[in-house]
């Protein structure tokens, strides 16, 4: 029973860290990455469709992205979606492909993005602490129902705290790595 609670807590904490990593892939750094465009939705065939489902996106020359559409009639829709996104990118249509040149980030924009990354890291830490609280509550409920001894409950709470400390350390490392990536010119 206690092992199940600890495993569940660990799984949920790992998912929180993975969600943070995925969320941070959409934060623009100095390098071009197809993941930058993951959140862009295009009006396609009457519905909002993720850009990566209507086009292939590749990196060209380090600082630019090339979008090759599967349906050439959607160029205007994709262009409109890129303008509407909050990435500050200007699409250039070259024949049947769209090029996105990523200008270097200004120092001010880097600091803004760094704050945003830090904030997302804090949100992940809060989620992890909530998971710890839920797990500890489950342990206390078992103790109250006399399904475990006090020593077993205390040991489980210590293990849950160790899991929490490790998860928060992992979040700090992910955030620190992304901030370093942002500050590298």
From Swiss-Prot:
Transmembrane segments: none annotated. Keywords: Cytoplasm, Protein biosynthesis. One of its GO terms (molecular function) is ribosomal large subunit binding. GO terms for biological process: cytoplasmic translational termination; translation. Its main location: cytoplasm. Belongs to the RRF family. PANTHER family: MITOCHONDRIAL RIBOSOME RECYCLING FACTOR PSEUDO 1, RIBOSOME RECYCLING FACTOR. Responsible for the release of ribosomes from messenger RNA at the termination of protein biosynthesis. May increase the efficiency of translation by recycling ribosomes from one round of translation to another. This is Ribosome-recycling factor. It comes from Xanthomonas campestris pv. campestris (strain ATCC 33913 / DSM 3586 / NCPPB 528 / LMG 568 / P 25). The lineage of its organism: Bacteria, Pseudomonadati, Pseudomonadota, Gammaproteobacteria, Lysobacterales. The gene is frr.
